Structure formats: C-alpha cells, structure tokens
C-alpha cells in the first residue's frame, strides 16, 4: 500500500502491475535522455562563440531529427501495446465478481457463491478503530484469494464511476448500461486499498475500495466474508 511522503509507485501485487512498473521505468529513462540532450544542445547554443550564416539547409541533421524521434516512439509504443493486450486477456478465471458503482458506495456480488450480494460503504470517522485508515477503510471488505485468476465485471447504476486498485494495476470504468470486465491474479496476501477514480459527484472522494487477499487454501475452505 502507499506510505506517507511516498514518491514512487506502490509495490506490485500482480503481474500486470509489475509490467507497468517496468514500463514506467523504461519510459522515464527515455524522457531523461531526451531532456539531457535538449539541455545539452541549449547549453552549447548559449555558450558557443561560433557563428555561421551561410548554411541554407542541413539534410543530414533533418534526417536525424526525423528518424530518431520515430525510433523513440516505437521503443515506447511496442511495450505499451504489449501491456495493453495483456490487460484485455481473460484466461479461464477461477472466480467472477460483479462490482456495481453507486453514489457513493460499491455493491459486490459473488456470482460463484449463490449470488451473495453486499454493499461496501466508507467507515465514518466515528466508527474507526485504532489502526484503521481515515477515508480508506470500509465496513465490508471484498475478500478474494491469491494465486487465482479473478474476473471483475464492473458496471454502474447511476453515473460514471471507475473501479481502481493501484497496487494491482487495475482501473476499469463503471458505465451505466454497460458491463466492463478486467482480470487479475494477486500474488501476495494482504489488505489493499483503492478509490473511485472518476469524478462522480459531491462525495466522489468517499467511496473507497478495500480488497482483503487471503491464501487460496483458506478461501477454498469456505468464503470468508467480513459482513
């Protein structure tokens, strides 16, 4: 999860997030190289005493600054497209969970367990226990297993929402009248937090998402729900 004064990304808890962190570092390295090259060229331009007013064209230079950006764009686009296709893959999920966005809470349905449905509201400050996180903890957590592919079916009952859990690399829009899906495989047990990531009204900031990921063997003994 996130820490106080954290600058970087959260630790990855899924293969997709691991790929996103690698791609982030890859793109950041390219950006640093471009910035260094531009600043170096600017420094040379400002400090040089040489002048040349007889040059009317520079085909070699124009060729370089046309081909080089194209190569850089390809180096960014290829891994980006690879991750994009990975996020769209749905490979025989073990569990299917339906998530419905409301103003301003989430409803979850375990479709594989008799259609168990419950609502998940943010805990008001008066109900927080020692160790709970303000504006992030909920009354009913979504309990899921690790090391098992999970499919999330996401929609909305009223306005646009977005179901997002950064540590899993997930962000899927919840659109009224449309059912979007995403899959993930968690690699570590723990409690992970997210929030609605689409401005959805006055209390947009108060509809957190909490996932409690437990070992698959414990989950298979019987669903453990914090109701």
UniProtKB/Swiss-Prot annotation:
It is found in: Mitochondrion inner membrane. GO terms for molecular function: copper ion binding; cytochrome-c oxidase activity. Component of the cytochrome c oxidase (complex IV, CIV), a multisubunit enzyme composed of 14 subunits. The complex is composed of a catalytic core of 3 subunits MT-CO1, MT-CO2 and MT-CO3, encoded in the mitochondrial DNA, and 11 supernumerary subunits COX4I, COX5A, COX5B, COX6A, COX6B, COX6C, COX7A, COX7B, COX7C, COX8 and NDUFA4, which are encoded in the nuclear genome. One of its GO terms (biological process) is ATP synthesis coupled electron transport. This is Cytochrome c oxidase subunit 2. It is a multi-pass membrane protein. PROSITE patterns: COX2, COX2_CUA, COX2_TM. Component of the cytochrome c oxidase, the last enzyme in the mitochondrial electron transport chain which drives oxidative phosphorylation. The respiratory chain contains 3 multisubunit complexes succinate dehydrogenase (complex II, CII), ubiquinol-cytochrome c oxidoreductase (cytochrome b-c1 complex, complex III, CIII) and cytochrome c oxidase (complex IV, CIV), that cooperate to transfer electrons derived from NADH and succinate to molecular oxygen, creating an electrochemical gradient over the inner membrane that drives transmembrane transport and the ATP synthase. GO terms for cellular component: mitochondrial inner membrane; respiratory chain complex IV. The chain crosses the membrane at residues 15-45, 60-87. Residues 46-59 are mitochondrial matrix. CDD domains: CcO_II_C. Belongs to the cytochrome c oxidase subunit 2 family. The gene is MT-CO2. Cu cation A2 binds at residues 196, 198, 200, 204. Binds a dinuclear copper A center per subunit. Signal peptide: none annotated.
């Amino acid at each position: 999860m996130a820490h106080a004064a954290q600058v970087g990304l959260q630790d990855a808890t899924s293969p997709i997030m691991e790929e996103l962190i690698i791609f982030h570092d890859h793109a950041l390295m390219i950006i640093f190289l471009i910035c260094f090259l531009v600043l170096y060229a600017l420094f040379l331009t400002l400090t040089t005493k040489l002048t040349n007013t007889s040059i009317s064209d520079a085909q070699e230079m124009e060729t370089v600054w046309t081909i080089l950006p194209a190569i850089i764009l390809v180096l960014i686009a290829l891994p980006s497209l690879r991750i994009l296709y990975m996020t769209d893959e749905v490979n025989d999920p073990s569990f299917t969970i339906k998530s419905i966005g409301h103003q301003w809470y989430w409803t979850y349905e375990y479709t594989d367990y008799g259609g168990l449905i419950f609502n998940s509201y943010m805990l008001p400050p008066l109900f927080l226990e020692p160790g709970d996180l303000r504006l992030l903890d909920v009354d009913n957590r979504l309990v899921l297993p690790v090391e098992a592919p999970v499919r999330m079916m996401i929609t909305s009952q009223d306005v646009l929402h977005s179901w997002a859990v950064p540590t899993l690399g997930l962000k899927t829009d919840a659109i009224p009248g449309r059912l979007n899906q995403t899959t993930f495989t968690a690699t570590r047990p723990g409690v992970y937090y997210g929030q609605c990531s689409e401005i959805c009204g006055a209390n947009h900031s108060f509809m957190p998402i909490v996932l409690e990921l437990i070992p698959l063997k414990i989950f298979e003994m019987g669903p453990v729900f914090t109701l």
